[in-house]
Amino acid sequence: MAGFRSLARQVRDTRCDLALRRYSLRKCLERFAPYGHRATWDHLCARHSIEPEDRAPDPARLVAALDELEQARAVWLAYEEGFADRRKREKHDGLRRPAAIDDWHRRTWGGNGVARCDSPGAHPSAPLDEVLRRLISALEDGPRAACPVCEETHIVWRQDLANEPWFGPVCAGCGIVVPQPVLTSEAVAAAKRAGRQELASVA
């Protein structure tokens, strides 16, 4: 199975036909897709003016989309390296029990779904690397009352997410499933109330 870097080389390889280069970019998303596969593809297509179903898109646009994905991946891999070093130090110091953020991190190792968007068409519009930097800052700074990506305070708890963790707080502004460790307990409680109110309004 080809890795991310091998697939990225195929995307850039002008000897390959455009259908294969597009396919290779889609396969890259099986290795790294911050919003989830479909939402990350929708994001890249929107930002780089690629028709999602076009089998022979402009090669310059394909490469620009890959560049954005690679920049975001570099940001995330650097964070993961620092995270792994921190856990090693903590274990060496006798701190074996992982924190809530560590449990969340285990589910997103590799960067897949790190800022998952439950609806493929609802995702942040900013460049992927910028979104990940905001998220990483929030993970390092501690809990807050607003979405770490767009600062929206209207966050709604959903019980019917399409992917793991299957339930959680969803930002009404940018569409990400907000990692619970970055929200205060009051913000999580408010999101659950908002979720119950939405359910009651459609009952």
Give names to the regions the model predicted.
Residues 1-33, 128-131:
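Short terminal alpha-helical segments
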Residues 12-20, 35-37, 52-56, 114-122:
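Charged, low-complexity interaction regions
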Residues 38-65:
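Short, charged early-sequence alpha-helical segments and their helix-coil boundaries
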Residues 140-144, 166-168:
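Residues immediately within or flanking Cys/His clusters that coordinate Zn2+
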Residues 147-150, 171-174:
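Short cysteine-rich clusters marking metal-coordination/redox-active sites
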Residues 154-155, 178:
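Cys/His-rich microdomains that often coordinate metals
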Residues 158-169:
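Short linker/helix segments within small regulatory modules
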Residues 175-192:
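Short metal-binding segments enriched for Cys and/or His
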